[in-house]
Design a protein with these regions (language model features):
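Positively charged n-region of N-terminal signal peptides that target proteins for export
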Residues: 1-5
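Bacterial N-terminal signal peptides
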Residues: 7-16
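Boundary at the C-terminal end of the N-terminal hydrophobic targeting segment
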Residues: 19-23
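Short low-complexity stretches enriched in small and charged residues
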Residues: 27-42, 126-128, 212-217, 280-286
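Long, contiguous juxta-domain segments that are non-catalytic but functionally important
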Residues: 27-67
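Juxtacatalytic substrate-recognition/specificity segment
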Residues: 55, 71, 75-245, 249, ...
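Short, surface-exposed beta-strand/loop micro-motifs that present aromatic residues
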Residues: 68-73, 314-315
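Acidic/His/Gly-enriched intrinsically disordered linker/tail segments
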Residues: 195-212, 224, 244-394
Length: 394
């Protein structure tokens, strides 16, 4: 991985500017955050700010100037997030969930009104950022990674890793309301006129980016946005773990992303297809009976078959369900072993010490034996029995 001196210089200059800008309150009250009021002490205490900051190819201010666009921005401990968050009226049935979430967040930001029935852009931004930070801790735990793992700077340098699970800079998320604006950003920044949700490896700063358009994905519901962001971040955090240097097995990464999304809210599902883009598939809230049927008919893809699938093109609708279930099984019954298995897989190095993604099927087979003490056939049997005993028939 190349990290040119000029890039480091640019990064540090921009960070210095950020610090200067943070000290100011926005002059106009209408631009002031309704959650933290841009209060420097409150922002500092909660390890967040509303920019400007370095982002994507340039920085948040330049993006707004170039595109004549006024999103809201937020930087937290592990993320930089920006975008449009249209006002959202909380549906009657969801009020309880949101009130509980807001009551919790009020402990950090006293100005929050937990009984509010409409979330403005600042509420939505702060709530999404909060959910993303919670997810970061959850993901790190699932990966079998200690919160202290990347805090030792000299150890990071020795291993050639950065502080963000192995990446050098924070994970980035961008949410556009309009498809056209999203396309314009994609063209300007990454040189691709894509409009589907996209993950991007920003090699200049060694960080992983994820973006989408609400209009394109027909996202109205706040939980649907939350789910699609968590799905994208599942991939990015997994990829970033011990540094993104080679591709992880597709069953593992897609299975994990589904597991995260479905654990958060099973009503909204995202499916990855080729080239890292995402698309929506059939709607089915409860996947468990469907997986049961596949096992009973002996039609579920086996571990032995799945470990060889190299691309999203080789994963059909039923495979998505099976991948999810296999992760559900491993994370629920063998969380510690799963973390060790995954950590070994992402940490592979060749004889010269370089990241090694070769012979991934052998590595997985050996990993199953070493960490779970199962051959792939044994793993298959264990999973099938567990799913039949655990999942409802209807
Ligand atoms: Zn705020």
């Amino acid at each position: 991985m190349k990290y040119t001196p000029s890039a480091i210089l640019l990064a540090s200059l921009l960070l210095t500017n950020t610090l200067a800008a943070q000290e100011k309150y926005p002059k106009k009250k209408k631009n002031r955050c309704t959650v933290c009021e841009h209060d420097p002490e409150l922002m500092e205490a909660n390890k967040m700010n509303h920019g400007p900051f370095i982002f994507a190819r340039t920085d948040s201010q330049k993006i707004m100037d170039d595109m004549v666009w006024s999103p809201v921005w937020m930087e937290t401990q592990h993320y930089r997030l920006g975008g449009d968050f249209p006002k959202w009226k909380i549906p009657e049935v969801e009020r309880k969930i949101y009130r509980a979430e807001l009551t919790e967040l009020q402990k950090k930001f006293p100005k929050i009104k937990p009984k509010t029935r409409t979330l403005d852009k600042w509420y939505r931004l702060h709530m999404l950022a909060n959910r993303m930070e919670i997810f970061y801790s959850e993901a790190r735990a699932s990966f079998g990674c200690s919160p202290l793992e990347f805090l030792d700077e000299s150890k990071n340098i020795r291993r050639g890793l950065g502080p963000f699970l192995g990446e050098k800079d924070k994970y980035e998320v961008m949410v556009f309301e309009e498809t056209n604006l999203y396309r314009e950003f994609m063209t300007l920044n990454w040189g691709l006129a894509y409009v589907k949700p996209q993950r991007w490896n920003n090699v200049d700063r060694d960080c992983l980016w994820f973006g989408l358009s609400l209009q394109q994905e027909e996202i109205k519901h706040d939980r649907k946005l939350q789910n699609i962001v968590l799905h994208g971040l599942s991939h990015n955090l997994l990829d970033g773990y011990m540094h993104y240097s080679f591709e992880l097995p597709v069953w593992l990464t897609e299975g994990y992303a589904h597991w995260v999304e479905r654990t958060n809210d099973p009503r909204f599902t995202t499916f990855c297809s080729v080239e890292g883009s995402l698309h929506e598939g059939k709607t089915l809230n409860d996947w468990r009976p469907e997986v049961r049927k596949l096992i009973k008919k002996d039609e579920a893809a086996t571990f032995a078959a799945l470990i060889r699938r190299a691309s999203f093109a080789e994963i059909n609708w039923e495979d998505h369900l099976v991948c999810w279930s296999k992760l559900d099984f491993l994370l629920q019954t063998k969380p510690k072993e799963f973390g060790e298995f995954l950590t070994e897989l992402v940490s592979r190095r060749d004889s010269k010490g370089y990241p090694d993604g070769s012979k991934m099927d052998d590595a997985q087979r050996n990993g199953f034996k070493k960490h779970f003490d199962w051959t792939l056939n044994q793993a298959e049997k264990k999973w099938g029995e567990w799913a039949l005993n655990t999942y409802p028939a209807k």
